């Protein structure tokens, strides 16, 4: 397979992964602030769908293409910037896995509240808080990965 084509797919995939994460987080966070169960239920459904379509596929493709590229380019996975990129990716993925479950729970709570004409219950806010708390280290991890991939060095390493 052509090296440039795989690099292109790797960059495109990382863009989809990061863009989907930022976009869905933005919309779910701000619609949640309205406390409008009907609006939240609609947006949460789309967020869950986008996560499965874009995030799940790219979270599988990224390490596969990255390891292939490193091997093809003769880079050891213990090269500091590559090693720490992998660590950051593992952290981000470890945050994402419970986030998926939380998003489905947020969706279900909002759908139930909207269907019964009730407000979002306190359980929604608790789940949203956990979702936000997990999103922060994932975001920082992805920003660090982008830096290391471009600079080919570890930030703050001197």
Give the positions of each predicted feature.
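Polytopic transmembrane helical bundles with strong interfacial aromatic enrichment
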Residues: 1-158
């Amino acid at each position: 397979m052509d090296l440039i084509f795989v690099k292109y797919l790797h960059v495109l995939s990382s863009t989809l992964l990061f863009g989907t994460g930022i976009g869905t987080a933005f919309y779910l966070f701000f619609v949640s602030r309205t406390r409008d169960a009907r609006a939240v239920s609609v947006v949460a459904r789309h967020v869950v769908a986008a996560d499965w379509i874009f995030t799940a596929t790219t979270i599988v493709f990224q390490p596969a293409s990255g390891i292939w590229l490193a091997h093809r380019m003769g880079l050891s996975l213990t090269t500091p910037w590559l090693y720490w990129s992998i660590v950051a990716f593992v952290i981000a993925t470890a945050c994402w896995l419970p986030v998926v479950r939380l998003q489905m729970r947020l969706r279900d709570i909002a759908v139930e509240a909207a269907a019964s004409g009730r407000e979002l219950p306190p359980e929604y806010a608790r789940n949203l808080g956990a979702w936000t708390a997990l999103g922060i280290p994932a975001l920082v991890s992805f920003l660090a990965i982008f830096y290391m991939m471009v600079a080919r060095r570890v930030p703050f390493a001197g």
